Structure formats: C-alpha cells, structure tokens
C-alpha cells in the first residue's frame, strides 16, 4: 500500500470531520460549502481508486446503503423511558415539592432546562469513538435498527472528536426537521407528485424509517443530543449540563437553548421565555424538559416504572387538534386572490379558540382530498393562520359534500381566472370588485398612473368607507360638498382636488392602460402595448397571439390582458371613463426624425444605476416621448443600456451580450439632439 495515499486520506478525513464539527455543532463554519465539497470530492476520488482503504466512519460513507427488506429489532441495554408531563404551573410546582420532600431538602434545587424537541428519539452507540449502531426508541425496551439511515445525517458524527472518549457510550437525542427543510421537502413533493407530510415531526419520522437509506440521505434531517444511556470504559462529569457541554466538544450537536435554573421562579421564567421565542426557533418544540442537574441526586431519586422521578416535561398547549369542517367559504383578497376558508366546529388550539382555517387554494383542497363534513387535523403555530394539515378519512360521514371552487367572484360576480402554472385563482373585476376597491383606486390615481395630485391613500379610504366611490369613474363625479366633508378637507382643499381631477382627464394612452391595474402590466408593458396597438379599440380586441407580438409580452401577460378586457364589468367602467367622463390622450404622433436624429425611436432601452441630472422617471418619460420602449430587464432584445453610477448586474449582462452601453451624459446629449 502506498503510505502517501493513506496519509492523504487520513488527513482529508480529519479535515472534513473538523469542518463538520464547526458547521453542525459550533454553528461557526470556517470554509465555504464549495471548499467543503472540493475536499469531499477529493476524498471520494482517492477512496474510489483505493477501495481497500475505505472505513465505516469515513465522511464519504453517508450516502446511503442498499435498501432493506425490514428493520432489525434492537433491545435497549438500558430502557429508553418516557417522561411524566406537566400541562400547567400547578403540576410543575407539585413536581418540585415532591422532589424536595423525597430528598428531605428544603433548599432550592438546580435544574438543567432544555427544549422538548418534537421529533423522533434515537439511540446512538459509539465504540472506541466510532458509530456502530443507531436505533429508534420503539416501546422503550425494543427499537428498530436504523444505523444505515442515521449514517446519512450530516449532523451526527460517524466518529467522535477529541480526547477522553469512553470505550463504549450510548448517546440519546432527537432527530428532527427544521421548518425550512420541511417546507422545501413538501414543495419538492408537490412538484414531483411525491408524498406531502402534514408536519415536520411526521416528515422526520417518515424519513428516518425509510427502508432505502438513499432516500433518507436526501431528506433535510438534523439532530440534537440530550442524554446518555450505556457508559463503559470512561467517566463523565457529575452535572447533566456539564455532560451536554462535553458531548458538544466531542462533535455531537447540542441545542444552545439550555440553561441552569435554580428554584421554581428561574424555571418558570425560562419556560415563559421559551414560549415567547418558540415561533422564531425555526423548528418545532412542544415544551420544556426540566431535569435535576446533579447526577448523584438523579441516582438517589431513581425511577418509577415508566419514567425518571428527576425529570418532567412541562408541555405547551397543543398546536394540533381534531375538529369537523362545517362549510367552506371563498374570500377575495385586496389583489383579487380567491382563498377558500374552512368553517370549523370551534376547538382550542395553542390556547386560542379556532373556528376558521385557510385551505390556501384549489390544489390544496385536491391534495388533501377534503370534503365538507370531514374530520380533520388543524394546526396553529405561533402567529401563523390556522390550517388544515390532514383528513381522517375513516371518520368521513356518508353525507360528506364535495367542495366546488367557484367560477365567478363571490363579491362582484366577475369571472375568476386561473392561469396555467399558477396556484392562485383571481377575480378579474379589478375595477369594480368591492374587495379590491381601495387598492385599485389608490393605484389608479397614483403619480405614475393618472397622477391625481392630492388624492392620497387616506382620502381614498374615506371615500370607499363612506361609499361615495365604487369605481374609478365615480372619482370624477365627486363634488365640493362631498370632498369638503371629509376628515382634514376644507373648502379650499376640495377645490384644489377637483381641479386635479379635471387636469387628470388629459393623460397619455400608456398611463391610462397602466392605471387600469391589469395583472402583470407595469409601466414598461403598458408603454409597449400602447405603442404597438395605437388605439384603445385595437388593444381591447387583440387576441393572445396578437398580444404576444409585443416585446416582453408572453403567454401569461397576454392571457391577463384578454381576460381583463373580456370582463363585462371592466368594459362598462372603461366606457364610462372614456365616453362619459371624457378622459382623453393625444393621438399618436408618427416620428419624422431620421434614424440619425433620433437614436431612441423604436428601440428597447434599459436604465440601470443612479442618475444625477434627471430622475429615473424624467428620463423614462423623455425616452418614451421619443418612441423608445423602456424595459426593466436586459435580454437579447435590448438595444441599448444607459448606465448611471454604481450600475450592477444589468450592466454586466449588457457587456456579456454585446449590447450598446452609454452613460448619462451621452443620454442627455442624444435626448437634447433629438428634440
């Protein structure tokens, strides 16, 4: 055997274990992920060339072995007992009193307080520092051998790190999944048609009990240790807290949220603090575990049949409960999103009476297989809106009703659109829908739209709440009496606002289209549409294929435009604005400049960076006036990029694509030249 190869492999293993320790235990990585991957790939390559040098504890051996047909049973040498529970302060205080009476000690006891993780309890057996067996808790006496699966979890060291490691030690802890990992796993499952889990605990348990370790290897599992079982050929500190710190030094992850608390007040303060930070932890817990810290006192207190006397789990109120769906209603959000909401038999969840739960969208109803009358599990975590996570199908009544998603808005009866590839269905009646009214009107009068000077958000709020205005056309029918009666509006302000409304009737075609609030139609798209179609009638009659001929208009935008102009309510409001109110815009002027005089005519231009001589809006207006289309992104269709100070990725992309780039001074010169 080449001694140099063995040395390289050993050094790489030591280095990789060191960085795994820093990443998973200390949460203080020294190198970027790419460098870790490079070292790992180098080790894999050397081991592939010299398979006789592969050892079970090598960092490369986490990828997952071949599938099993069944899990072997493992008998725990020391039973993995459960904990007694406290669900209120009185029960916890009784526990503390019981301990002091048993110990014949009136002094306050010091406890090690930890998070009660909501995952799957596991046992890890290390011999001479190497992981040789992993098992589930099972019934406390017998569990399942999950060694190959656990070896794939990067947070669990295959070999302990440091000095004074016992010859044989069993570490106990919890395998769990973070909220972020859980969300990513379910997103991927929905995308690929895989199994969607109800909560992180189910996801962790299902991932850990896979017969195929290669599947487990792809799941975002992690681990915290909290105790010890078998101990042979070594010594540990006589404090539980100190033991956890020792485990951390050996490379085993330990939660940072552990604390020594002396006396009941300190313990209760810790409990309430954890309850407060619980929503921001990033993983699920269901309480606090309170353990006598002194190991000698633990041994003196001993055990009852199923639990230690020296520990208790002080549980939080449940985040999941069962209830029955009585009905489903459909709500309309301020942007027109249609959200199904389940009406429930009221039930207490996490300290709050819950009678409604979001169902998100039609896809979620289909995924759950949900019907009215079903018994369901609902979940409420932190400030998150309660949601239905699963259906208990065996409790489904014979008269359960199918949930039918509406085709018309329940508020304004406009058509509901759902574009292929989008989960959310939306009301198309943006100009008349009461649910969307405030936001639609605020957009309509905004500076880049109809530019009604003085018509602020608070005025719109009052006009809608007092039912003076329902559609954009109603704004132009307001009189001095109505306006002067609004909060903080006198006669002078009312006259000024009426003048601003009158002035706004003379606008541009692009501003008018932008003001309508068609989904996905921003300023740049409005400019492109109006430059291409020239007249309102032509744009209203355009089909999807005709719309897609406009630069930067694809399938989705084209469908939104067609759906908007096909909706009868929208047609009526547009007709009122143009025919009754008299909103007008100049007829398009055909440019007479030769190309040499006007380098912007018909060109797609992108502005990037900070401008010093003009505001971005002023520059955009002058460019559009000369026939340019101002886009927000650089692509192969871009003709010119105008780069101000601190121009970033757009400038880099323009250079990469070979697009003409000019600075602000050159833009000003060309604008002035083209007047």
UniProtKB/Swiss-Prot annotation:
Domain of life: Bacteria
Name assigned to this protein: DNA ligase
One GO process term, biological-process aspect: DNA repair
Stored SUPFAM superfamilies: BRCT domain, DNA ligase/mRNA capping enzyme, catalytic domain, Nucleic acid-binding proteins, RuvA domain 2-like
Listed cofactors: Mg(2+); Mn(2+)
Biological classification of the source: Bacteria, Pseudomonadati, Pseudomonadota, Gammaproteobacteria, Enterobacterales
Record bears the keyword Cytoplasm: no
EC assignment: 6.5.1.2
């Amino acid at each position: 055997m080449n001694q140099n190869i063995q040395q390289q492999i050993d050094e790489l293993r030591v280095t990789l274990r060191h960085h795994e320790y820093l990443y998973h235990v200390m949460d203080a990585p020294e190198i970027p992920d790419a460098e870790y991957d490079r070292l790992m790939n180098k080790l894999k390559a050397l081991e592939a060339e010299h398979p006789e040098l592969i050892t079970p504890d090598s960092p490369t051996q986490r990828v997952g072995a071949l599938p099993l047909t069944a899990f072997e049973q493992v008998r725990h040498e020391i039973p993995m007992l459960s904990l007694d529970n406290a669900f209120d302060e009185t029960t916890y205080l009784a526990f503390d009193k019981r301990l002091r009476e048993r110990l014949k000690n009136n002094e306050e006891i010091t406890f090690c307080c930890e998070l009660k993780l909501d995952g799957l309890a596991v046992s890890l057996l290390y011999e001479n520092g190497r992981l040789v067996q992993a098992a589930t808790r099972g019934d406390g006496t017998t569990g399942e051998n999950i060694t190959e699966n656990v070896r794939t979890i990067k947070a669990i060291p295959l070999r302990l790190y440091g000095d004074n490691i016992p010859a044989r030690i069993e570490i106990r802890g919890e395998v769990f999944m973070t909220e972020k990992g859980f969300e990513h796993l379910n997103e991927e499952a929905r995308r690929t048609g895989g199994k969607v889990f109800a909560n992180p605990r189910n996801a962790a348990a299902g991932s850990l009990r896979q017969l195929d370790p290669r599947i487990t290897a792809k799941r975002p599992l992690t681990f915290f240790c909290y105790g010890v079982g078998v101990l042979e050929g070594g010594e540990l500190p006589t404090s539980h807290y100190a033991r956890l710190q020792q485990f951390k030094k050996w490379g085993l992850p330990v939660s940072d949220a552990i604390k020594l608390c002396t006396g009941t007040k300190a313990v209760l303060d810790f409990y309430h603090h954890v309850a407060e930070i619980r929503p921001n932890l990033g993983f699920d817990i269901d309480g606090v575990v309170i353990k006598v810290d002194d190991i000698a006192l633990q041994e003196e207190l001993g055990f009852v049949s199923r639990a230690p006397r020296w520990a208790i789990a002080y549980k939080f109120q449940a985040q999941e409960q069962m209830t029955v769906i009585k009905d489903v209603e459909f709500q309309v959000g301020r942007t027109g999103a249609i959200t199904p909401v389940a009406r429930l038999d009221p039930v207490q969840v996490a300290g709050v009476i819950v009678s409604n739960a979001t169902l998100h969208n039609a896809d979620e109803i289909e995924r759950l297989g949900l019907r009215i009358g079903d018994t369901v599990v609902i979940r409420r975590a932190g400030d998150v809106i309660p949601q239905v996570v699963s259906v208990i199908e065996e409790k489904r009544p014979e008269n359960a009703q199918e949930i039918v998603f509406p085709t018309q808005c329940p508020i304004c009866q406009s058509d509901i659109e759902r574009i292929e590839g989008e989960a959310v269905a939306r009301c198309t009646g943006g100009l008349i829908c009461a649910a969307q009214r405030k936001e639609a009107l605020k957009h309509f009068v905004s500076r880049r739209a109809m530019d009604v000077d003085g018509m602020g958000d608070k005025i719109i709020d009052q006009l809608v709440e007092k039912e003076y205005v329902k559609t954009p056309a109603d704004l132009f029918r307001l009189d001095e009496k109505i306006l002067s009666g609004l909060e903080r509006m006198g006669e002078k302000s009312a006259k000024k606002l009426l003048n601003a409304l009158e002035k706004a009737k003379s606008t541009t075609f692009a501003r008018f289209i932008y003001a309508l609030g068609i989904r996905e139609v921003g300023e740049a798209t409005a400019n492109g549409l109006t430059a291409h179609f020239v007249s309102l009638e032509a744009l209203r009659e355009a089909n999807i294929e005709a719309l897609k001929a406009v630069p930067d208009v694809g399938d989705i935008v084209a469908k939104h435009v067609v759906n908007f102009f096909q909706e009868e309510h929208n047609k009526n409001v547009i007709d009122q604005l143009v025919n009754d109110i008299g909103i007008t815009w100049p007829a398009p002027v055909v440019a007479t400049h030769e190309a040499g005089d006007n380098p912007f005519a018909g060109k797609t231009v992108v502005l990037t960076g900070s401008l010093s001589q003009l505001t971005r809006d002023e520059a955009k207006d002058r460019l559009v006036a000369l026939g340019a289309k101002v886009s927000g992104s650089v692509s192969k269709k871009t003709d010119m990029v105008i780069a101000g100070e601190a121009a970033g990725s757009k400038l880099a992309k323009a250079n990469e694509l070979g697009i003409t780039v000019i600075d602000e001074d050159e833009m000003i010169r060309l604008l002035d030249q083209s007047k």
